[in-house]
A protein has these predicted regions:
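RecA-like P-loop NTPase motor core of helicase/translocase proteins
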Residues: 1-3, 7-168
Length: 168
């Protein structure tokens, strides 16, 4: 049933951790509006992000940064046809729990904050450097790999130049 919801005209939310990266990706998608048959939008604030999500029942491509999720506790949207795509998923997308330190300060992981804001969304993480340590695991946060695009494929596609190492 989860796959049916994803195929049911989802709203795509693209999350980055930096404004310059958000602007770059938004610009790339904006140039493809005719191919995508819709115009991407960039959320200006948490309130604007909520308006963009609540103001539609389906479709749409919304760009935002992680920081916009930090400003509130209430869910932004409870729809199940939202797909969250996180770029550079190895940076800052950890912590599904809340922890209390010796002084009683509560620390909430970024992954938990986003999932509280969009509790019924599906999540996809994009990274070139997945992390796997005790308290930071890209696979734990986003699940198994959907696809792996390695350096050999990138060179074959002319997406990157080959890297050569010469021992001295």
């Amino acid at each position: 049933q989860r796959q049916m919801c994803i195929r049911d005209s989802p709203t795509i939310v693209v999350i980055t951790d930096r404004n310059d990266l958000d602007d770059q990706l938004f610009g790339q998608f904006s140039r493809c509006a005719s191919f995508l048959r819709q115009t991407a939008v960039q959320a200006e604030s948490r309130r604007h992000l909520k308006e963009l999500l609540v103001g539609r029942e389906a479709n749409g491509i919304i760009f935002t940064t992680m920081q916009k999720f930090m400003d509130g506790d209430e869910p932004l949207c409870d729809r199940s046809n939202v797909v969250v795509m996180v770029d550079e998923a190895h940076r800052g997308q950890y912590g599904l729990t809340e922890k209390i330190d010796a002084e009683g300060n509560i620390s909430i992981g970024a992954a938990r904050i986003v999932r509280k804001a969009l509790p019924n969304a599906s999540y996809i993480g994009f990274t070139g450097t997945p992390i796997s340590t005790q308290d930071r695991s890209t696979r734990e946060i986003f699940g198994d790999y959907i696809d792996v695009y390695d350096m050999t494929q990138a060179v074959e596609d002319n997406a990157t130049r080959p890297v050569y190492y010469e021992s001295r």
